[in-house]
């Protein structure tokens, strides 16, 4: 995942919808983003709306996991150098959050 290494700031913080506290650091953030790649059915995953304002981006996405529709947003804060400093994911509806939690835990156990 060399692309992630180049994209993430060393002091990045990742906030997951399935973990209670924010996750600090590049290596842990990478681990969660890789697990998300296995979780989010990337064949159907698509960004449907983007809003950018200076060093902040909000990207709305949709996908389907095990026949459950998932709708969410990635909220990203960038450094002046173009690296991700803060990455927060929010998901709805509740059934989707539960499915993502189940799949993420499984993907993380395999890493």
What are these regions, as identified by a protein language model?
Residues 2-54:
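A solvent-exposed, acidic/Ser-Thr-rich amphipathic alpha-helical stretch
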Residues 37-111:
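A beta-strand edge to alpha-helix "cap/lid" segment located at domain peripheries
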């Amino acid at each position: 995942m060399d692309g992630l290494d180049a994209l993430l700031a060393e002091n990045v913080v990742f906030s997951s919808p399935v973990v209670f506290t924010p996750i600090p650091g590049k290596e842990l953030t990478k681990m969660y983003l890789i697990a998300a790649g296995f979780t989010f059915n990337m064949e159907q995953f698509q960004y449907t709306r983007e809003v950018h304002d200076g060093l902040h981006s909000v990207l709305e996405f949709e996908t389907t996991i095990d026949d459950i529709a998932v709708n969410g947003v990635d909220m990203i804060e960038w450094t002046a150098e173009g690296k991700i400093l803060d990455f927060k994911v929010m998901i709805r509806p509740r059934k989707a959050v539960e499915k993502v939690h189940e799949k993420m835990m499984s993907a993380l156990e395999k890493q």
